[in-house]
């Protein structure tokens, strides 16, 4: 089943890597959201926070899964955090994919970043549960994301009841 998927990533550092992943995704007859050109993002980020939140919320409409592309500096970023919390509240399936081993436009890899799901928790049965214990993470290179991302997304959607 084709899924409409929102991709969350650190735009200035990981845009090229994200674009490579997106291109592999759409060549497999999939739909993606959360990808936009640099001109669009430059315009959006000039707006007030409430307008940026509204724009992100609009990007999430119609999606069933959110994939957080985890680079060296993804965790803790304001808009990444907003996209994670909004996706969780919306009931989207979530997963993370480490992209540090994916080469950038200069052929370089980067250091592994912190799992952004470690910064968030929910309460279940009176107990604090980290999102990192709920949502899986994978490595794009080491776990063969090109071949397996569709399966990961489908599993996340099913886990979320989508």
PLM segments and residue spans:
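Conserved beta-strand termini and adjacent loop/short-helix elements that scaffold enzyme active sites
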Residues: 36-38, 97, 132-134
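Conserved N-terminal substructure of TIR/SEFIR domains
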Residues: 1-62, 145-162
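Short, glycine/charged-enriched secondary-structure capping and boundary segments
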Residues: 20-23, 81-84, 109-111
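Anion (oxyanion) recognition and catalysis
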Residues: 88
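Conserved nucleotide-binding/hydrolysis micro-motifs of P-loop NTPases
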Residues: 12-14, 101-104
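Short glycine-/acidic-enriched loop or helix-start segments at secondary-structure transitions
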Residues: 17-18, 78-79, 106
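C-terminal interaction surface of TIR/SEFIR-family domains
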Residues: 4-6, 105-162
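Conserved beta-strand-loop-alpha-helix hinge of the TIR/SEFIR fold
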Residues: 59-85, 93-103
């Amino acid at each position: 089943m084709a899924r409409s998927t929102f991709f969350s990533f650190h735009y200035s550092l990981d845009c090229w890597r994200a674009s490579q992943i997106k291109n592999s995704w759409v060549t497999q007859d999939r739909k993606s959201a959360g990808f936009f050109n640099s001109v669009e993002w430059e315009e959006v980020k000039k707006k007030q926070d409430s307008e940026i939140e509204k724009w992100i919320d609009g990007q999430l409409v119609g999606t069933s899964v959110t994939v957080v592309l985890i680079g060296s500096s993804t965790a803790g970023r304001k808009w990444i955090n907003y996209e994670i919390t909004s996706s969780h509240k919306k009931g989207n399936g979530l997963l993370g994919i480490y992209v540090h081993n994916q080469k950038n436009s200069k052929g370089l890899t980067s250091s592994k970043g912190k799992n952004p799901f470690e910064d968030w928790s929910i309460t279940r049965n009176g107990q604090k549960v980290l999102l990192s214990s709920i949502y899986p993470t994978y490595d794009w290179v080491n776990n063969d994301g090109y071949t397996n991302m569709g399966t990961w997304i489908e599993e996340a959607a099913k886990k979320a009841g989508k």
